[in-house]
């Protein structure tokens, strides 16, 4: 009731079940701890609700597949919430690659490292599937898969674990069938109590490279990326970026109202789940 009054909502619910039982509710956004995504996505879809669910949809490919089967059985939409995938910044970088600006992609490197969290945070607890791979690494896995449109043949990974048995720092190297390589590092190791984050990317091609920062940025503003050619020329391009969460919700709304294809498809979510599962197996999570 306090939340309703503060933000001016029409209704407040005493439980998730009460919300799902309301026939006026058409869609829900699930941002619960990782261990609860699967359970409540299933309950919501069986109640006839469209579901936008935070990443990761589930801890393994098998459960991700089951979620999409449940969506089809109940004639509802399910989309994994990767807000940054809706960003004009990512769209612009993808277009540079598609247009051949840097030639054939040879190598992708990315990093997403944030401040340390206190021990009570759900990201730091094994029982809620915490750890940097589930929380941050999925940005780099999805970025790599989205740019290369193929899955790696070989995955090597190593991690540093905390006392709570979650990965605090993970590094991954991937090799693809045609010789391409990709690597990333994710972590929650920057100084505690400082609102700091490092997220950056580099894409190297046969004719040049693209470098950028804040690829997972979710606020209003401008973002820039730099194109460097093999001849040594350099160009900085700036992109206006609105709030990615808004773009994500608007796109999901169009799926419901206009049967638009989800920006993050079932096929993509399954590919990403497979890759994350391989990484977690490699590091012994």
Regions found by a protein language model. Give the residues of each.
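C-terminal capping/lid region of NAD(P)-dependent oxidoreductase domains
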Residues: 76, 103, 281-285
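Predominantly a Rossmann-like dinucleotide-binding segment in NAD(P)-dependent oxidoreductases
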Residues: 84-163
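C-terminal helix-rich "cap/oligomerization" subdomain common to oxidoreductases
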Residues: 6, 27-29, 177, 237, ...
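Hydrophobic residues in well-ordered beta-strands that form the structural core
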Residues: 13, 53, 78-80, 109, ...
């Amino acid at each position: 009731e306090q939340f309703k009054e503060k933000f001016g909502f029409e209704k407040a619910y005493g439980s998730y079940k009460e919300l799902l039982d309301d026939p006026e509710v058409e869609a829900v956004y699930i941002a619960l701890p990782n261990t609860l995504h699967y359970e409540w996505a299933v309950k919501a879809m069986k109640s006839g609700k469209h579901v936008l669910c935070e990443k990761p949809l589930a801890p393994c490919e098998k459960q991700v597949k089951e979620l999409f089967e449940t969506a089809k059985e109940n004639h509802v939409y399910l989309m994994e919430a990767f807000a940054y995938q809706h960003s004009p910044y990512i769209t612009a970088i993808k277009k540079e690659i598609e247009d051949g600006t840097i030639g054939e992609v040879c190598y992708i490197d990315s990093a997403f490292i944030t401040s340390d969290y206190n021990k009570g945070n759900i990201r730091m607890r094994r029982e809620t599937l915490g750890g940097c791979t589930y929380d941050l690494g999925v940005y780099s896995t999805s970025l790599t898969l989205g740019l290369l449109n193929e899955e790696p043949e070989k995955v090597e990974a190593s991690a540093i674990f905390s006392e709570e048995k979650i990965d605090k720092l993970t590094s991954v190297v991937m090799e693809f069938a045609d010789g391409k390589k990709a690597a990333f590092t994710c972590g929650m190791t920057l100084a505690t109590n400082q609102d700091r984050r490092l997220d950056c990317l580099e894409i190297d091609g046969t004719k040049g490279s693209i470098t950028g920062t804040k690829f997972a940025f979710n606020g209003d503003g401008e973002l820039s990326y730099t194109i460097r050619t093999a001849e040594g020329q350099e160009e900085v391009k700036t992109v206006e970026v609105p709030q990615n969460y808004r773009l994500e919700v608007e796109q999901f709304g169009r799926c419901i109202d206009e049967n638009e294809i989800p920006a993050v498809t079932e096929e993509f979510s399954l590919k990403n789940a497979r890759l994350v599962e391989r990484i977690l197996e490699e590091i012994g999570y």
